[in-house]
Design a protein with these regions (language model features):
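N-terminal signal peptide
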Residues: 2-26
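N-terminal carbohydrate-binding/catalytic regions of secreted carbohydrate-active enzymes
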Residues: 38-115
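Alpha-helical scaffolding within the catalytic cores
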Residues: 53-56, 110, 222-234, 265-274, ...
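A solvent-exposed, charged loop/short amphipathic helix patch at secondary-structure junctions
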Residues: 88-95, 139-175
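Conserved, mostly hydrophobic/aromatic
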Residues: 127, 243, 312, 320
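Aromatic-lined carbohydrate-recognition surfaces of secreted/lumenal glycan-active proteins
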Residues: 166-229, 263, 278-294
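Glycoside hydrolase catalytic-domain groove-lining segments
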Residues: 232, 236-239, 244-294
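Aromatic-rich peripheral "rim/lid" segments of glycoside hydrolase catalytic domains that contact
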Residues: 307, 311, 323-375, 380
């Protein structure tokens, strides 16, 4: 065990003080966000997540008092294009500047009251909107449709404008509406359920996926341009109550220094962004991770459990959210696979990391903070 500095509120601290854990005496929290309720109800396979100290909703429901995630069609009237149709179909206006913010907020009230019936909801509250990004320049590849459709809207009203004039106006209209849509959504959510830890999934990201370009020379570092772009999202960090970056690992990164660097850089950028808002404290960071390699049901190796869960704890994150989809409870075989994984490598490792975080907090921080690495690029771990 390497002794790490304590993240707490001393007067001379270079870092902002951290908020208290959302669960008492749990400086590092591991939460479950997967629809696994059918494993027990349909197949008689109990996962017993509580036995490993994993925070889970009642009956392992996907949405509940501890963790709730809203997808694009579950909160208000989110505008987007259905890319699967030819030509793409606009839903709720398609682009944010072509949508009704008031109608969206009105529907959103009903959705939150239905999904979060308790006014005292104090769990993780995650909004997963991935169809478009609020910065115009980041709408590349399939998301380029939001730039092209925005330009069409401008050209329709200004047929004599040059392409440059159209693009400048389209960018301004899109970003202005995107900011309003995302920030007003957070404001309303926080007013309705003020104790919830509201934030957007995948924010921040630093787009350090270039391991495909030069695997051997991959450093993991976030491109400086993307760091600058994250700084432009200060309005979003000011409205967020928590940050939910993703540290999903593809199998190509298995058991490699590149995988450790990939995750480490994402965590470092999220923790940097957490310091940017004007609040006295830093924002809590809960990194979304998969216990399996992305797009598979292949278990993370022991080394990659360390590179994800262990590294998040050592870096100073508030916790990890283990995400899964309907495949987890698709059949008895998948449920049994998850149970065996929990009993084998995953569950004991979660216990190890959370206990190490508790002990370090008690002995180094006197129970009033979280241990974290002295240097973001360090490879020190809590266990």
């Amino acid at each position: 065990l390497l002794l790490l500095p304590c993240l707490r509120p001393p007067a001379a601290a270079a870092l902002k003080p951290a908020l208290a854990p959302i669960v008492q005496d749990r400086p590092f929290l591991v939460a479950w966000n997967a629809p696994s309720t059918r494993c027990l109800s349909a197949y008689g396979v109990p996962l017993n997540l509580d036995a490993f100290g994993i925070l889970v909703n009642r009956r392992e429901a996907f949405a509940g008092g501890n963790v709730t995630i809203f997808y694009y069609d579950q909160l208000g009237l989110y505008p987007y294009y259905q890319n699967s149709s030819v030509p793409p179909t606009a839903v709720n206006g398609g682009c944010p500047q072509n949508a009704s913010l008031q109608d969206h907020l009105g529907k959103m009230v009903k959705d939150i009251l239905r999904t979060m019936p308790s006014e005292s909801f104090a769990g993780l509250a995650v909004i997963d909107w991935e169809n478009w990004r609020p910065l115009w320049i980041r709408n590349w590849d399939k998301k380029n449709i939001y730039r092209s459709m925005s330009a069409q809207l401008v050209r329709r009203g200004n047929p004599g404008w040059s392409d440059e004039q159209v693009d400048l106006r389209a960018k301004w209209e899109f970003e202005k509406a995107a900011v309003n849509f995302m920030s007003e959504t957070l404001k309303l959510a926080r007013s309705l359920r003020p104790r919830g830890w509201w934030g957007y999934y995948l924010f921040p990201d630093c787009y350090n996926y270039h391991y495909w370009d030069d695997f051997g020379g991959y450093t993991g570092h976030c491109p400086p341009l993307e760091v600058q772009r994250n700084n432009k999202l200060l309005w979003l960090w000011e409205q967020s109550k928590a940050l939910y970056p993703s540290i999903y690992m593809e199998e190509v990164l298995r058991d490699s220094p590149q995988g450790e660097r990939f995750v480490g850089a994402k965590l470092s950028e999220a923790l940097r962004v957490a310091e940017l808002p004007s609040a006295r404290h830093s924002l809590p960071v809960f990194a979304y991770a998969r216990p399996f390699y992305t797009y598979t049901l292949k278990e993370l190796s022991q080394a990659d459990l360390v590179h994800t869960i262990g590294q998040a704890a050592a870096a100073g994150a508030h916790g990890i959210v283990l995400w899964g989809d309907v495949e987890y409870s698709r059949n008895r075989s998948n449920c049994q696979k998850i149970r065996d994984y929990l009993l084998g490598a995953l569950g004991p490792y979660v216990v190890n990391v959370t206990l190490a975080a508790q002990l370090c907090s008690r002995h180094v921080c006197h129970g009033h903070g979280r241990c974290r690495r002295r240097r973001p690029d360090s490879t020190a771990y809590l266990h």
